[in-house]
UniProtKB/Swiss-Prot annotation:
Full protein name: Protein A47
Stated family: Belongs to the orthopoxvirus A47 protein family.
Family annotation (Pfam families): Orthopox_A47 (PF06334)
InterPro entries: Orthopox_A47 (IPR009402)
Length: 244
């Protein structure tokens, strides 16, 4: 009976208080840990749903473009170094006058394999052993594709490319165009910063004559430029393929 009124000693009170704090800490730690796990799971589920919601299932336009160009380039594999040199020399001469390229295209389309005299009108292929063209149809198709790609460009672009060939600038143009294509083709609009090697005067003019606008060093992109940029990129890639 008397024990009920006995107060715990100071040491016992400290021990009890310490035990209560530890129990509270453990409960708090468990609650915090449980909350974190639940929160983490919720965030992961939300992130997963968000990724599924914003995922856009569209083809990569750049890969499609490169694939088509690669198929054309493969047809040039049988053209040896000497013939490539002669072909490029003749094309450079004709690039200054697009009407010559157009006339050549007409000659190629109307070419009669059974009439050897008709070959004389195809001057650009005069050094290509054209009489045996039936044995090298792939090379013939490559040249045809190259000329068609050049006809899609305007006179100013052709003259700039003729200068670029003479000054070994085609590869630099390819790198700059690929930088632009990778950063623009899959978006409708964008302001793309061009720096250093991507902002040379000649390359800027090639873009300007394709219809694009560059303010200071910022390219004002719109999806309507996909075709003219694709045409420019294709022609430069095919021209570079012929260089030796």
């Amino acid at each position: 009976m008397g024990n009920k009124n006995i107060k715990p000693s100071k040491e016992n009170r400290l021990s009890i208080l310490s035990k209560d704090k530890m129990d509270s800490f453990k409960r708090g730690s468990w609650a915090t840990s449980s909350f974190r796990e639940k929160s983490r799971a919720t965030i992961q589920r939300f992130s997963s749903l968000r990724r599924e919601h914003i995922k856009v299932d569209h083809p990569d336009k750049f890969l499609e473009l490169k694939r088509g160009i690669y198929e054309i380039i493969q047809k040039s594999s049988s053209i040896d170094v000497d013939k490539r040199t002669k072909l490029m020399s003749n094309i450079k001469t004709m690039m200054i006058n697009p009407f010559m390229i157009e006339g050549l295209m007409t000659s190629l389309e109307n070419l009669d394999p059974d009439n050897k005299m008709s070959y004389s009108s195809v001057m650009i292929l005069g050094e290509f052993d054209i009489i045996n063209i039936s044995d090298n149809e792939a090379a013939f198709e490559f040249i045809n594709s190259l000329l068609k790609s050049l006809l899609l460009l305007n006179t100013r672009q052709l003259k700039l490319l003729e200068y670029s060939i003479s000054n070994d600038l085609l590869y630099a143009h390819i790198n700059a165009l690929e930088y632009i294509i990778k950063n623009t083709f899959n978006v409708p609009e964008r302001q793309l910063i061009l720096r250093g090697q991507y902002l040379t005067p000649i390359f800027s003019d090639l873009l300007k004559y394709a219809g694009l606008t560059i303010k200071s060093n910022i390219l004002m992109w719109n999806k309507q430029f996909i075709k003219p940029v694709s045409d420019l990129y294709t022609s430069i890639r095919l021209l570079y393929c012929v260089t030796v």
